[in-house]
Amino acid sequence: GLLASLGKVLGGYLAEKLKP
């Protein structure tokens, strides 16, 4: 669903931001 897609995008964004 839309929320699942949004969560996936947000998770990827956070993962990139938290990468050293």
Curated annotation (Swiss-Prot):
Protein name: Dahlein-5.3
Tissue: Expressed by the skin dorsal glands.
GO MF annotations in UniProt: nitric-oxide synthase regulator activity
Keyword Secreted: yes
GO biological process: defense response; negative regulation of nitric-oxide synthase activity
GO-annotated cellular components: extracellular region
Protein's UniProt keywords contain Secreted: yes
Function: Has no antimicrobial activity. Strongly inhibits the formation of NO by neuronal nitric oxide synthase at micromolar concentrations.
UniProt KW keywords: Amphibian defense peptide, Secreted
Subcellular location: Secreted
